Amino acid sequence: MAREAHLEAAKHHIEAASKHLAAVGKYNQGDIHGAERHSEEAWVASQVADGKSVEAHRMATMALKMKLV
């Protein structure tokens, strides 16, 4: 279960990175407003991905504790 949670978190991190790259692309094209919008979306996606990572690590820690008990 923790493994699946880590894979899900990784998927969200890749999505966030893609949004960050889209923001950079818009900025490089001179589209400041588009870059700002993509940057905000990327920030939100990063927060979601970080939350998923925290949950995955919590699951892994609990699984390890159960194994050691």
Segments the model singles out, each with a brief description of its role:
Residues 7, 67-69:
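A structural motif
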Residues 25-65:
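Short, charge-rich amphipathic interface segments used for partner binding and complex assembly
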Residues 1-26:
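N-terminal acidic leader/helix
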